[in-house]
Amino acid sequence: MEDTKQRILEKSLELFSTKGYDAVSVGEIAKAVGIKAPSLYNHFPSKQAIFDAILETTSAHYQKDTAEISVHVQDSQKDIPVFSHISEELLVEKVRQIFLYSLHDKTISQFRRMMTLEQFRSPKFAELLSKRYVDWMISYDAGIFRALVANGELRNEDPDTLAWMYVSPIIVLLSVCDRQPEREAESLAKLDAHVKLFFRTFNIVGGEK
């Protein structure tokens, strides 16, 4: 039964990411899974319940995977020791890791595409997309920068503004790769250049700049 439930979640997300949430029926999901529509209700009472389960499992999946590379999006305090006195090369490597993971992990990529498709049709999806791919990232990096400014490792600038400057190009490059996968190499080069410039502009080495 658990295998069937997992297949329902996987096939639903696949369909939602290509056609949009509203355009997919329960019958279509059941057909993709290889079961009859009434059987699907033995596992989930509604399409909304399927979406809620996808949201929960995707969030857990993301938090587990990113924690392995010391990125705790909802608790930046855990990662301050990782980013304190980090080298330019290591910072570039870590940003590349999270960027490539977000781009190529099947579950995360499909979930982002689903939200992107639905953002203009549903205020709920628009809010969720902003929360996951803007608000959380800004809050996370602002928390890191706030600690580094206090420690004298970053220039004494507003941490929230620094976070917006840092995160915005990354979000743009991710969206470019979603729309045009053939531009991945170009986007990675731009990502590296952005992180290096930010590091050299705001990092303090041997005193205030």
Model-derived features with residue positions:
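Helix-turn-helix
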Residues: 7, 11, 15-57
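Amphipathic alpha-helical interface segments
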Residues: 11, 15, 57, 97, ...
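Residues in soluble alpha-helical coiled-coils and helical-bundle/repeat scaffolds
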Residues: 45-49, 53, 103, 120, ...
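Short, basic, alpha-helical segments at the C-terminal edge of helix-turn-helix-like DNA-binding modules
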Residues: 56-62, 69-70
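Hydrophobic alpha-helical connector segments
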Residues: 67-106, 163-166
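Short alpha-helical scaffolding segments that buttress acidic/His motifs in well-ordered protein cores
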Residues: 95-99, 112-116, 166, 170, ...
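Amphipathic alpha-helical packing segments from all-alpha helical-bundle domains
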Residues: 103-116, 120-150
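Hydrophobic/aromatic-rich alpha-helical bundle segments in the mid-to-C-terminal region
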Residues: 127, 131, 135, 145-197, ...
